[in-house]
């Protein structure tokens, strides 16, 4: 997908542009650019105008890929608070069913580190 062309098409339409940024973030992550992915996801969240359910776990994935493990775990804890099903392996697997293998593995790695960390 040509994201520059999609962004040009969506200009002035935040309802469309937020989807462009969200997808662009995943594409950048797939290309090994987690910092850029996070920036695109932040833009998508800003255009969303609220607290999108996907922001905590996508931030966790991007930060994990940047080796910012503690911050990634803090974001994953926020994801669990907003989506309690992510507190289980089954919930994580259900979320990532249609994801790419490396994306799913990253989420599983974050989950395993979070689950192993003492709570409280």
Where are these regions (language model features)?
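Residue-level recognition of tetratricopeptide repeat
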Residues: 26, 57-61
